[in-house]
Amino acid sequence: MSNTAAELFRSARLACWYSAWAAGACSLDDARDAVVGADAAHDVLGLRDEPVPLVLALGMLRATGAGVATLALPAPGDLTGLGGPPEFNADALEASEAVLLPSSGLGLVPTAVGAGVTWQVSPAHESHTVPDLVEADTALRETLLESSARLADLDVPRWRPEAAEGLQALRHPAGEPLPAGYGVRAQRAAALALRCLGLCDLALDDDGGAVSAWEAAERRDALGRLARAARHALVAACSAGVRAA
């Protein structure tokens, strides 16, 4: 597990390390440890009448024929990575994340319960909206340039110095947040996407320095576009599987 792996959404961790384990790129124990991270424990609902510990659930899911997992990070008006049915989409949208196992027709949605996490397994259709990695990576970099220029015009350093520092740090995103076996482009795209999402969360926290409602709306629009591009890039990277370019 890399130093930056804990920054991944829980569903991103599960999608990546499940795919890596299924491909033989990591051990079952390593996959379990990476997914659980700092949480107390992860249990899976819907495979048996009682909750199943994650380490056992991974094997049960593999037995269904699921070889690759894909990620969804839905937001209102953006269901990229989801394929239905509506009930699963609604649960994923409420959680803002989900894992799909296309070969088995199943999906998982996490819920934090105290210091632990439960995953609900439900029927889920394969998504045909998972972004292409090259296209999503390129789109993120183009959106970052555009958003940076717009935010600079809106005097970001004055209203949010931490955001200005974050923009500078985006020039050199560090670490490889995905498991070994994922390609260089996937690692690079995921690292940049995580930095961008962190920046957007910080900068959207308040409009304290906005001098007008128009300026505040412009900032939210620029950051919203960047967050959407970052989500798509992270979905593409985490869904690419091991040995992706």
Where are these regions (language model features)?
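Alpha-helical oligomerization segments
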Residues: A152-A245
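Generic structural signal of hydrophobic/aromatic residues within well-ordered alpha-helices
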Residues: A31, A41, A57, L61, ...
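N-terminal intrinsically disordered, low-complexity regulatory tails that precede a folded domain
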Residues: M1-V99
